[in-house]
A protein has these predicted regions:
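A beta-strand/beta-hairpin structural motif
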Residues: 35-58
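OB-fold and OB-like beta-barrel modules that bind single-stranded nucleic acids
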Residues: 5-13, 31, 59-71, 89-92
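Acidic, gly/ser/pro-rich intrinsically disordered tails
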Residues: 1-3, 15-23, 52-55, 79, ...
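Residue-level preference for beta-strand/loop junctions
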Residues: 3, 23-25, 38, 61, ...
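Histidine-centered metal-chelating micro-motifs
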Residues: 51-52, 70-72
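Short aromatic-glycine-enriched beta-strand elements
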Residues: 17-33, 83-85
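OB-fold/S1-family single-stranded nucleic acid-binding modules
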Residues: 70, 76-97
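A short glycine-rich, His/Asp/Glu-containing loop-to-beta-strand
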Residues: 4-6, 25-33, 39-43
């Protein structure tokens, strides 16, 4: 079965880096993707060295993500089991937009500054 996600959006908050009991880094963040009529929000995560290398990603950073959908089970505070669908980001590219080039001209420069 095919499970592939490609999405581009802006981070909605600073990412949260945690470690599992075995020492694996997990980076969690959310992105907002503007659609034609509405904005969609996706919770994302990365694992391992990629997670550690993206820890400095800030709120509002535009990212291009390639990955897959994953579902995890967790317990709510009231004890009920619940499920959450997230994007496991296998690749995360930062994209920057510069709207001022120092000459008084607005530009729409687009460059990849990190690929993980």
């Amino acid at each position: 079965m095919l499970n592939r996600v490609v999405v581009q959006g802006r981070t909605t908050h600073h990412p949260e880096l945690t470690y599992t009991k075995k020492g694996t880094a997990i980076l969690r963040f959310s992105i907002a993707v503007n659609g034609i009529n509405s904005t969609s929000f996706f919770d994302c995560f990365m694992k391992g060295k990629d997670a550690e290398s993206h820890e400095l990603m800030g709120k509002g950073t535009e990212v291009f993500i390639v990955g897959q959908l994953m579902q995890r089970r967790y317990k709510r505070k009231n004890g009920e089991n619940s499920f959450k669908t997230e994007v496991f980001a296998e690749e995360c590219n930062y994209i920057t937009f510069s709207d001022y080039d120092g000459t008084g001209q607005n530009t729409a420069r687009n460059e990849v500054i990190h690929s993980g």
